[in-house]
Amino acid sequence: MDKKPPLTLYLAAPRGFCAGVDRAIKIVEMALQKWGAPVYVRHEIVHNKFVVDSLRDKGAVFVEELDDVPSDRPVIFSAHGVPKAVPAEARRREMVFVDATCPLVSKVHVEAERHHAEGLQMVMIGHAGHPEVLGTMGQLPEGEVLLVETVEDVARIEPRDPGRLAFITQTTLSVDDTAAIVAALQARFPGIRGPAKEDICYATTNRQASVKAIAGRIDALLVIGAPNSSNSRRLVEVGSAAGCAYSQLVMRADQIDWRAIAGARAVGVTAGASAPEVLVDEVVAAFHARYDLTVEMVETARENVEFKVPRVLREA
């Protein structure tokens, strides 16, 4: 039998589920226990196929619009948040609904409303079309939120009154890219108001920091996550920017391109905030099967954040 080549696997920590994702999944599971199947979920509860498929197997039905939900069945709004019009329509139809919006996203919604109440126009740093961005922009009347994705976009926006602006950000952005966009906004609009610190959440920040911590030791980085997961895609970009010659997103172990990492002697592994640890275990097992493996954990922070589920699910 051929001798396995040696390889060190660096597991970044923190990785995987954040408190908002954990809460959202619990909400669907508790709703199924409380009301029985089917329970409808507007949009994927979190952006991970493995999670969505497992909840679907338990009786969750995933739809994109409220129109697809029968009025007599409960509906859950995804962790990414929804425009104000969605719960308003659910109330009009007298539907039972549970909002699984991450509390850190809801905090951004509150910021936007507070600035709007003071007569400020909002600038949102985020990715066009992402559900979180659609939900946050949908908290205010049309035209009240200007979206910028890049430093170049800052030069293109035309606010109503350049002296009456505030900015907010999507919670799952690249920390470094966002800092550059904020600097561009402050240079063009010196009076622009913003949060005490950017709205990028603790989990996004921590996962990016852990990738940077291992980047100098590895030949390749694998990020476990879904293609539609914003925070997972940012981790791939952070890895590349930190000097990883090969930085790749994989949903599961069967997507690993073994030829692409054939020459590697050290590989980093992390997981996006909506990827369960079972998928990390699967990847580690796949490396064990091919290599004489040494596994090292590199921990840059400890997370103990926990969010309560809504009261309606805690009541008997």
Curated annotation (Swiss-Prot):
Dimethylallyl diphosphate binds at H47, H80, H130, S229, S230, N231, S274. GO terms for molecular function: 4 iron, 4 sulfur cluster binding; 4-hydroxy-3-methylbut-2-enyl diphosphate reductase activity; metal ion binding. [4Fe-4S] cluster binds at C18, C102, C201. It is an enzyme of class 1 (oxidoreductase). It catalyses: isopentenyl diphosphate + 2 oxidized [2Fe-2S]-[ferredoxin] + H2O = (2E)-4-hydroxy-3-methylbut-2-enyl diphosphate + 2 reduced [2Fe-2S]-[ferredoxin] + 2 H(+); dimethylallyl diphosphate + 2 oxidized [2Fe-2S]-[ferredoxin] + H2O = (2E)-4-hydroxy-3-methylbut-2-enyl diphosphate + 2 reduced [2Fe-2S]-[ferredoxin] + 2 H(+). Binds 1 [4Fe-4S] cluster per subunit. Pathway: Isoprenoid biosynthesis; dimethylallyl diphosphate biosynthesis; dimethylallyl diphosphate from (2E)-4-hydroxy-3-methylbutenyl diphosphate: step 1/1; Isoprenoid biosynthesis; isopentenyl diphosphate biosynthesis via DXP pathway; isopentenyl diphosphate from 1-deoxy-D-xylulose 5-phosphate: step 6/6. Disulfide bonds: none annotated. One of its GO terms (biological process) is isopentenyl diphosphate biosynthetic process, methylerythritol 4-phosphate pathway. Gene3D superfamilies: 3.40.50.11270, 4-hydroxy-3-methylbut-2-enyl diphosphate reductase, catalytic domain. Belongs to the IspH family. This is 4-hydroxy-3-methylbut-2-enyl diphosphate reductase. It comes from Paracoccus denitrificans (strain Pd 1222).
